[in-house]
């Protein structure tokens, strides 16, 4: 539903801390250490509580109102075939991996069981036949490393193990008592830190293995504080890989990547037929060392027939108040099921409160009691057993509302929505904050064994749109509109009859269907599966974690093969570095072809070419101390030093080479593949590989990260700046008249990884030829794999300023342009009203496509005239901005923030909340009133006939974008005088407000319709216009007819959109321009009818 409270994505992240190098001399303050200690203790307690909860006695749903007879056999998973664990292997695609604490199980070839609690990993997945699987993986214990202190030998191992185990047990008092030793083993081994090149090879490290994952944090903390070792005093131990999640640690060691296929060999696993812990069809136990992991290549790239469920709910709210689960009932829950790979949903189900008329193609199940309705849905979930659950804003509205409502009504068996028997789905609050998105509060609902893909959260994270309502995104990506029912109307439909409830159910089913369409169209599931495979993390991590865990996983895998360890780095310092180079643009309108040359994967290529990595970094002065020859290391443009690959090949360059070569193979396979499902997988894979390669550089420069390294990130951008400058110099020195070319080439602009070159030729074909030649020639001057490629030609080309340009793009065919490309202009920005984007786009189209600058000027003047004369529809004037912080947290007053506060006072339930985009228009007010005081809700403006501040829109919204476009064509001084002054700006229309101001103290008097003079009676005309009364009446009737015809057209269009030509239009979609037009015309009709009533009833002579 579009009225749901929308809040932003993501789990909470710690407050930002500044970045610093590994070798900073300053020690952290005691206060910072205490804060870190508190944070770790809280994390331990949360993990401990979660593990304890997992051990609660089963209470799963029993009975319920959704009987077996109500279930279509096609909804269920296929019946389980006989499986012999001794002769048949079990092969399945895992979707989610987590862990819990339980009792050990006797397994073939496994160690003897004990009464102590042990960590058990749990992999949920699906077989090729569609059977659901839960695999309990035993025998893997958490561990981390620390350098052995000087003088430490094998004789000290038992003493350290005893001291550390005692210290951890003492530290855990007050919590759950440990049933056995905290430290299982401490071993001596040879490893090397990945941070910096030391030249001495491996050194002694201690591998500390613990009983439970939650003991890693206290063990690390106690070791950092110092542990007594007989004969060595109380040395402090620096932790390595102690901040790695238990699941990631297991997947790295077992060589398992996200969503890959696992094989359990025959005779190595035990099938649980009794005492099952989950609702899965197949539940097995196996040793972690017996699990075979298949790399996602060839036949193992396929995706199992996953079952995807999309759902939506409707609530009956009170008038003007947003639904609250403590008071407002759930009246409908609609669900659609899809088997991945099939074209159509196999399941359409509407659960309704009170009888509902049948719906073609869907099963309708009605209930008289809300408690029965609520119990039926989890029972249906249990029967259908979905692998993936999707919807629109289910994370922040649907799921929390259902769970809270069931709790209010004491439907105790409702919140068992996951696959683990007896484990409740709980709600917890989460907060995410960053410079890019500000602060977003959200909720997280646990549903173990099922992957949640909230399409609103996906779109917020991956796409920048003006509006994120389901209607807006459906129109943007699918080209489809939908009926949008206001929450206050939903109650009226519910209280109507079977047909009105049917209409509500159809609306609800469509709201469940559209997220499925979006999931398929945007390839969200496929892309995330492939990203999980490429980066090696569980699928759930991609949806709830940040970017860094993806690089950490790849880094750990590569490091393990070479005996390298990742240190735990405390980020302290606060340095910054210079970003990429932008060559100063030569602004203007170019009516000649401009060739664009682009560095392919610039930052990854730089890191590979120059061997930039943690493992190759030299400390200041280290090159001399280690006796390195000048040809064995490089000095970067920023003064940092790294050894060359001949001395040591860096980890990051190896990771990048693997990613880019895998992408090349995936693209080659994609070009040959004909099967549409396989093409989707390959396309998702090559995209995941590209994104992963580009994110490695960002990982090294992250302010608060697992392993920040300023030396790498600043060196990369330093080389990038140097290469752009060198490319400019090479192009302009070769392509000259002296060297036999038609003209002297000129680089008109360069930005980060691309340069725009004017070769002085007149045809696109010649520019393409010279562009390819120049790309190959320049590439020969840079080390491999750095490569400059010809990308496209712009003709014509409008260069406005840095990061702002537009042109017709030719990439392959010199005779036909691909599209009109705009960067940084209001045509593609979302922080202006649609009028700006539409006017900029239409003006650019006239300039670039039609080659008619004069026509563009005339069109812009016409639009400005329409604006000043109040002929622009209000939907074109709506500005939307995101509410990223509370009002008190903004440094200055903001228009959308102030409006949100006013709307909260009018109606707290429907007011925008954090993470929402707030639509508003600027209305007219007294001179000197600040713009933030003039923001108002568009619907409120229409209902109360508030005047629009057209001068604001002309001066603050249209003026600068138009001048940016037309100044290169008309000249800086002339553009302003032609566009913003002149006859077209002299005629203005101002509406009279019906509320506020001095109108509260004035008495309204009628005016003559003919001459506008004040009259003292209720009639339509004065005595001087009386002879023309018939003529004036006919004129107003004609105006009324025109309004009625316009309203009928708009009404019919809305009826077609809602799918019924015989029902009232109740849609209130604020993202649809038709809605505002319909509201405006309806109001104009009412005013016109009142005006005609002033003429009085027709006299006898009219008959």
Curated annotation (Swiss-Prot):
Residues where Zn(2+) binds: 1008, 1011, 1022, 1025
Pfam name, any one: zf-C4pol
Required co-factors: [4Fe-4S] cluster
Keywords for this protein: 4Fe-4S, DNA damage, DNA excision, DNA repair, DNA replication, DNA-binding, DNA-directed DNA polymerase, Exonuclease, Hydrolase, Iron, Iron-sulfur, Isopeptide bond, Metal-binding, Methylation, Nuclease, Nucleotidyltransferase, Nucleus, Transferase, Ubl conjugation, Zinc, Zinc-finger
Cross-link Glycyl lysine isopeptide (Lys-Gly) (interchain with G-Cter in SUMO2) mapped to chain: 570
Compartments, as annotated in UniProt: Nucleus
UniProt record, GO biological process: base-excision repair, gap-filling; cellular response to UV; DNA replication proofreading; DNA synthesis involved in DNA repair; error-free translesion synthesis; fatty acid homeostasis; nucleotide-excision repair, DNA gap filling
UniProt motif Nuclear localization signal: location: 4-19
Coiled coil regions in record: none
Span list, region Disordered: 1-29
Placement of sequence motif CysB motif: 1054-1072
Co-factor note (free text): Binds 1 [4Fe-4S] cluster.
Catalytic activity, as annotated: DNA(n) + a 2'-deoxyribonucleoside 5'-triphosphate = DNA(n+1) + diphosphate
Example of a GO cellular component annotation carried by this entry: delta DNA polymerase complex
Similarity comment: family membership: Belongs to the DNA polymerase type-B family.
Protein name (Swiss-Prot/TrEMBL): DNA polymerase delta catalytic subunit
Provenance organism: Mesocricetus auratus
Taxonomic classification: Eukaryota, Metazoa, Chordata, Craniata, Vertebrata
